[in-house]
Regions:
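Phosphoinositide-dependent membrane-docking surfaces
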Residues: 86-109
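Short aromatic-glycine-(Arg/Gly/Cys) micro-motifs in beta-strand/loop hairpins
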Residues: 111-118
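Conserved beta-hairpin
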Residues: 34-89
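Bacterial N-terminal signal peptides that target proteins for export
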Residues: 1-12
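C-terminal partner/receptor-binding element of secreted or periplasmic proteins
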Residues: 118-150
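A short, structured loop/turn motif at beta-sheet edges
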Residues: 67, 100-103, 130
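C-terminal motif of bacterial Sec signal peptides marking the signal peptidase cleavage site
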Residues: 20-23
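Bacterial signal peptide processing site
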Residues: 25-27
Length: 150
């Protein structure tokens, strides 16, 4: 039946257009306060960065160390088994030197990507809410600016 084929083609076309219109989440645009560490004081800013990282959903952070030069954190990493199902967990760690940070992007889905000047991803965090993603971004950029000034 020609009418049924037309309806089927329209339905397929509508599904395809809907799928393609989803796209990627957009980066949140805002001006970071690069004096935040100076305004809060270094110990308070370090504690806020630690507290924010502990609330990270992915990766689940278990230990954080913040110095004037770098951010170091340990987290649980799943060991993938057959068909991608995790069979256990191991500890992993990451150290991000503030001088190596080129840019920090926070997205609408609470994902934060920390990139070097060469666009290499230095860290990737997913937070439960936009406030934690914004605070993590602001503090990293403020620590980077403070390190660049010294």
């Amino acid at each position: 039946m020609p009418g049924q084929n037309t309806r089927y083609a329209v339905l397929v076309l509508l599904c395809l257009v809907s799928f393609l219109s989803l796209g990627c989440p957009a980066a949140i645009q805002y001006q970071a306060n690069e004096r935040l560490v100076d305004e809060l004081g270094v110990p308070q800013a370090q504690q806020r960065l630690k507290d924010t990282l502990y609330r990270s959903i992915n990766p689940p952070v278990t230990e954080v160390d913040v110095t004037n030069d770098f951010l170091h954190y340990r987290y649980r990493q799943a060991i993938p088994g057959p068909f991608g199902a995790p069979v256990g967990f191991t500890m992993a760690e990451n150290r991000v030197f503030f001088t190596n940070i080129g840019r920090v992007d926070a997205f609408e889905n609470h994902l934060v990507l920390v990139r070097s000047a060469a666009e290499i991803v230095l860290a990737q965090m997913v937070f439960a809410n936009a406030e934690d993603a914004r605070m993590f971004t602001e503090l990293l950029l403020a620590f980077r600016a403070r390190r660049a000034r010294s």
